[in-house]
Amino acid sequence: MSSSSKPFLRALAGETLTPPPFWLMRQAGRYLPEYRATRAEAGSFLDLCYNSDLACEVTLQPLRRYGFDAAILFSDILVVPDALRQHVAFKEGEGPVLTPIRSAEDLSGLDLSGLHDHLAPVYETVKKLSAAIPKTTALIGFAGAPWTVATYMIEGSGSKDFAKAKGMMFGQPELFARLMALLVQATGDYLIRQIDNGAEAIQIFDTWAGALPEDMFERWVIGTTRTLVERIRTERPGVPVIGFPRGAGYLYKRYVAETKVSGVSLDPSVPLHWAAAELQPKCTVQGNLDPLLLVAGGEALDAGIDRVLKALSKGPFIFNLGHGITPPTPPDNVARLAERVKGWKG
């Protein structure tokens, strides 16, 4: 039982609340006209991530509109490789482009020593948000999980099949293990520093967890996440961690049991009845409305919201999407969702 006045933190501590707390992944984003204006003011996407005043502003924008129970730091999972001195850029219409890590020589060019100096503007954003958000709103810090971040670092961009990343994992296992060890260290350092600046909970995004076979999932998704959870629990006791092993399917059950996360975020493919029976007795569940229902709106949206609420609100639960809000989402549909979740009587 949590003594917190913040519903989001109470739910993560195991309380069942009616209505459940809610926030949405990518709640600060291109679907909001005020975000697009601030983004234009910033210049590049990374400039926005590293401008603490503007990053704070875009984090607060959806709170003003919708009254979410949590704010999530506005940043990107690729600030970690950027801070490790890998070249990272975001190209309009293309997404992230990185100078790929393919060899021991490439790996030797990465440097942990400047991590905190490089990420100082992000920590400043966290500090400003901690002071700016409403008293009942929780502040979530986050990072990409080592496997997911490694896919971008090795591929040099997004990928459909992760051929280069898996090629290193299977064909150069020692090199891959060295990269993952560096990412576990850097990610842990980064998250601890976010907590020290005011983050009250952490979410670890493993967007490409579902791409791995079970033995590699066990080592590189469960194993690395467990290390991060244990470190946070030891060094900053009381700060809950939410894991998001997107696409993990049946392996969600092992992930929850073996990482010991406080909460788990469910993608839209996870059956609700199964999540309620198999996952919710062990940790708080978060999710899992399909983001495209939020684009569609109308009765389909209402029915989708109700289906999730009916299935999961009998135990510790945080309402969310199964992945991030997409740019075509009408802001009025988000208002409709907020009103419906806030009005839920069980």
From Swiss-Prot:
The keyword Lyase applies. Signal peptide: none annotated. Its EC number is 4.1.1.37. It holds the Pfam family URO-D. GO terms for molecular function: uroporphyrinogen decarboxylase activity. It is found in: Cytoplasm. Gene3D superfamilies: 3.20.20.210. It catalyses: uroporphyrinogen III + 4 H(+) = coproporphyrinogen III + 4 CO2. InterPro entries: UROD/MetE-like_sf, Uroporphyrinogen_deCO2ase_HemE, Uroporphyrinogen_deCOase. The keyword tRNA-binding does not apply. GO terms for biological process: protoporphyrinogen IX biosynthetic process from glutamate. Keywords: Cytoplasm, Decarboxylase, Lyase, Porphyrin biosynthesis. One of its GO terms (cellular component) is cytosol. Pathway: Porphyrin-containing compound metabolism; protoporphyrin-IX biosynthesis; coproporphyrinogen-III from 5-aminolevulinate: step 4/4. The record marks 76 as: Transition state stabilizer. Substrate binds at residues 26-30, 76, 152, 207, 323. Homodimer. Catalyzes the decarboxylation of four acetate groups of uroporphyrinogen-III to yield coproporphyrinogen-III. Belongs to the uroporphyrinogen decarboxylase family. PANTHER family: METHYLTETRAHYDROFOLATE:HOMOCYSTEINE METHYLTRANSFERASE RELATED, UROPORPHYRINOGEN DECARBOXYLASE. This is Uroporphyrinogen decarboxylase. It comes from Paramagnetospirillum magneticum (strain ATCC 700264 / AMB-1). The gene is hemE.
